Design a protein with these regions (language model features):
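Glycosyltransferase-associated regions of secretory-pathway enzymes
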Residues: 1-66, 71, 81-225
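Short acidic donor-binding loop at the edge of a beta-strand
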Residues: 76-79
Length: 225
């Protein structure tokens, strides 16, 4: 597999100077090729037999990135990172995929507070995720083998979730790049924070824990905006 990392900046929010500096350094530090995807270039990667969900157009910039990274990891594989400070090379982490039993390489969730908050009807699953948080991968950076049972189920669950949200998305499209359910106490955008990211990704990590590697260092989570 090519040692290529995808980064996304989607939506109409301008990138801050700090984010731009972080993006400029990712290739140098990771020792990997970086492909930067924007609204202007993303259509080049959408496969004719696998179009984006109808609801994509109504998403915020953040949730567009959540959707896109799942799509790219399934159809293309390779690395993904948030546009944050990276401290270490990724070359050895990519080498973990030399083992065919490894499907996803990432870093362990930092603490139990990083576990995605599922909907109330999934209380039992939520308890299991919180109990086993140390086995979950963080959402900020990872490397995926394409077209595995993990990524296939990821896309299936993502599109099913988007189907459920679609009627409300049409009524209440995102107001800004970081919109989420209840933002500022008034947002009617239907998707909660991590609603199409960790809420899908974390249960899959627990299901396919035997196919995970934890050989990636996390990005920096402070002072990145």
């Amino acid at each position: 597999m090519d040692k290529r990392i995808f980064c996304f900046w989607l939506g109409n929010s301008p990138m801050s100077e700090r984010r731009q500096q972080n993006l400029d350094r990712i290739s140098q530090i990771t020792k990997c090729e970086v492909t930067f995807i924007t609204d202007d270039t993303i259509s080049e990667y959408i496969k004719p037999d696998a179009p984006f969900h109808e609801g994509y157009q109504y998403l915020s910039g953040t949730t567009k990135c959540d959707y896109a990274r799942a799509y790219f990891m399934h159809h293309y594989g390779g690395g993904y990172t948030d546009i944050k400070i990276i401290y270490y090379p990724w070359t050895l982490s990519f080498d973990e995929l030399d083992d065919p039993s490894i499907w996803v390489v990432g870093y362990r969730e930092i603490n139990g507070g990083g576990v995605a908050r599922l909907s109330p009807e999934k209380k039992e699953l939520q308890e299991q995720l919180c109990k086993n948080w140390g086995y979950l991968l963080g959402n900020g950076a990872f490397i995926c083998r394409p077209n595995t049972p993990f990524t296939r189920e990821w896309m299936d669950e993502l599109n099913k979730t988007m189907d459920e949200y679609l009627p409300e998305l049409k009524k209440n499209p995102a107001r800004d790049s970081r919109d989420c359910l209840g933002k500022d106490g008034v947002s009617m955008f239907p998707i909660p924070w991590a609603g199409i990211a960790g809420c899908i990704f974390h249960p899959l990590c627990m299901k396919y824990v035997d196919h995970l590697s934890y050989a990636l260092y996390p990005p920096e989570f402070v002072d990145y905006l």
